[in-house]
């Protein structure tokens, strides 16, 4: 996950080109198709921007870009911080230039990459609640 996040965030650095975003392996799952219909129109007041892919499972907002991807494998239990936002469990990881938040207990998973400019990063997660809630639950929750 960290290597994938690093590749994604490198596409965010300092230019106005569309961010380079890799499409997750399960992006075409029916659950991600449903989740993509619930992506927010804006995040932190920032509108949707183009990315390097036209996959509906990938969306970005603003500059620097907040990036969301649906179609990752569900996370295994972890000692990383886990928060519940509007009934959705999220695992938080600190990155060199921001944070990632990945749904926990959803299959497939959504990952949201949030640049430091939007700190504190968890405050952006309510915008992704409807998309995350569209994913099937595995029954696992933050503890």
Tell me what each language-model feature is:
Residues 21, 38-39, 76, 88:
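Secreted/processed peptides and extracellular or luminal domains of membrane proteins
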Residues 45, 50, 55-102:
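Mature extracytoplasmic domains of secretory-pathway proteins
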Residues 23-46:
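Post-signal peptide N-terminal segment of mature Sec-exported envelope proteins
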Residues 79-143:
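Extracytosolic low-complexity repeat regions of secreted or lipid-anchored proteins
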Residues 15-19:
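Bacterial signal peptide processing site
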Residues 1-5:
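Bacterial N-terminal signal peptides that target proteins for export
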Residues 10-14:
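C-terminal motif of bacterial Sec signal peptides marking the signal peptidase cleavage site
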